[in-house]
Amino acid sequence: MELEVFAGQEKSELSMIEVARAILELRGRDHEMYFNDLVNEIQTYLEKSNSEIREALPLFYTELNVDGSFIPLGDNKWGLRSWYAIDEVDEEIIALEETDEEDNPKSRKKKRVNAFMDGDEDAIDYSDDDPEDEDSYEADPALNYDDENPDDEKNEADAYDAEINEIAPDDLDEDVDINEEDDEFSDDDAEGEEE
């Protein structure tokens, strides 16, 4: 295969990405290529060995993805972005999304009727909850606190007493003297400071 674009140029000076672009341009729009076939044709044109191609393959694949002139067409097929108008690319993406939705139909939710809305289409129906809200929250019954249950209050008091006993056990026989008079500060000093 001979590429007229590179006539007179040394093949060893050409990059794989340049050759890929030239090969795809030569083949035309209706002949997009699988990645493996594209690499094989590049290898044939540049007359490189398998080990040279294997070594350059990660960089080539990265350049192919980063270079804005190439477009992945799915199933590891590649083409040139210039072959497709922007609107056409969007249409293909939308068509793929529509087929995905057809494959996985969503279950319909029953419509609730609000008697107070009276057919006012502009009114906001606040009773129409999000699907995430439908999953009800069920608390652990052991954690449920009942105001009328005296056992809850007793358990709470016992837990409080246990915490106090951890800090100051009941068997301490020390007398703690509280000295109400403070030598450094007296009530007279406080009155003098306020004035």
UniProtKB/Swiss-Prot annotation:
Keywords from the named record: DNA-directed RNA polymerase, Nucleotidyltransferase, Transcription, Transferase
InterPro entries registered for this protein in UniProt: Asxl_HARE-HTH, RNAP_delta_N_dom_sf, RpoE
GO molecular function: DNA-directed RNA polymerase activity
Gene3D superfamilies: RNA polymerase, subunit delta, N-terminal domain (1.10.10.1250)
Domain HTH HARE-type residue range list: 14-83
Name of one Pfam family that matches: HARE-HTH
Domain of life of the organism encoding this protein: Bacteria
Compositional bias annotation for Acidic residues: 119-138, 145-195
Keyword Transferase found: yes
PROSITE patterns reported in the protein's UniProt record: HTH_HARE
Record-level GO cellular component terms: DNA-directed RNA polymerase complex
Region (Disordered): 119-195
Record GO biological process: DNA-templated transcription; regulation of DNA-templated transcription
Recorded family membership: Belongs to the RpoE family.
Reported function: Participates in both the initiation and recycling phases of transcription. In the presence of the delta subunit, RNAP displays an increased specificity of transcription, a decreased affinity for nucleic acids, and an increased efficiency of RNA synthesis because of enhanced recycling.
NCBIfam families assigned to the protein according to its UniProt record, in alphabetical order: RNAP_delt_lowGC
Oligomeric form and interacting partners: RNAP is composed of a core of 2 alpha, a beta and a beta' subunits. The core is associated with a delta subunit and one of several sigma factors.
Entry protein name: Probable DNA-directed RNA polymerase subunit delta
Organism: Streptococcus gordonii (strain Challis / ATCC 35105 / BCRC 15272 / CH1 / DL1 / V288)
